[in-house]
């Protein structure tokens, strides 16, 4: 349903939702952290604690790897290749869509709300993950980092900017944009990327943020499950029909 024909969306409220991917729509279910650990071990690099591994879900992987003891300019590319190969071969399929997310995306589309993804994952991998998880048809545009992870990396602010352009919200003033677009993510980077463009951000607590991170980052709202997220989106987007009912 095109945006212009959606009677459920009130003019002046958000008409788009920008979602993070890993930890927000899809649970890597250990595919990312386990894959990183295996790649490090294969290169005889010390494997960090689970807490550190969890913190690597969200930000650019190359940046996170370079911060680890034992990762050098000489071995980082090989570690990345090892991880990516494992992720493509088995990690994507092992990932799982969070409960209620598929139904929520479907209903947002039926209400005429544009659904974009803004992720630090390389864009081709993001497309592939959405296809493998059966979500590709429920997302209107996908925005990620450069496929070559050795080139300067686009930050979340730049990736959100690309999503805003895709949904047609880059040409409106900040007040209108704030009323029409909502960001949803699980890490500090999502909150910062949203606020850099004057957007409200719903932080989902089922992802990979350490305790207190989303609150400290200034997330405008918090959702503990898809039902709470549905209620918040209904309120912020000014929808006249219930999103929560689609999750039953």
Please tell me what each predicted stretch does.
Residues 7, 12-13, 89-117, 123-127, ...:
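Short, acidic loop-to-helix structural element flanking the phosphoryl-transfer center
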Residues 39, 60-74, 129, 159, ...:
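Helix-loop "lid/cap" segments that line or gate small-molecule binding pockets
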Residues 134-144, 213-230:
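Structural recognition of alpha->loop->beta junctions
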Residues 66-103, 111, 173:
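Metal-dependent phosphoesterase signature
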């Amino acid at each position: 349903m095109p945006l212009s024909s959606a009677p459920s969306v009130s003019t002046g409220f958000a008409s788009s939702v920008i979602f993070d991917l890993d930890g927000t729509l899809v649970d890597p279910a250990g595919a990312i952290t386990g894959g990183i650990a295996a790649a490090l071990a294969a290169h005889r690099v010390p494997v960090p604690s689970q807490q550190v591994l969890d913190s690597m879900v969200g930000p650019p992987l190359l940046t996170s790897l370079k911060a680890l003891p034992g990762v050098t300019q000489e071995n980082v590319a090989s570690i990345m290749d090892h991880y990516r190969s494992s992720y493509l071969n088995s990690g994507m399929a092992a990932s799982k869509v969070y409960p209620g997310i598929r139904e929520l995306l479907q209903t947002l589309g039926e209400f005429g709300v544009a659904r974009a993804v803004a992720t630090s994952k390389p864009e081709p991998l993001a497309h592939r993950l959405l296809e493998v998880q059966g979500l590709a048809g429920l997302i209107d545009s996908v925005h990620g980092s450069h496929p070559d992870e050795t080139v300067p990396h686009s930050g979340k602010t730049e990736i959100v900017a690309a999503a805003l352009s895709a949904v047609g919200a880059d040409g409106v003033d900040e007040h209108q944009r704030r009323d029409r677009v909502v960001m949803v993510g699980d890490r500090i980077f999502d909150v910062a990327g949203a606020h850099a463009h004057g957007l409200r951000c719903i932080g989902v607590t089922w992802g990979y943020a350490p305790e207190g991170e989303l609150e400290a980052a200034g997330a405008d709202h918090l959702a503990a499950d898809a039902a709470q997220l549905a209620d918040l989106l209904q309120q912020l987007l000014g929808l006249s029909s219930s999103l929560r009912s689609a999750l039953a």
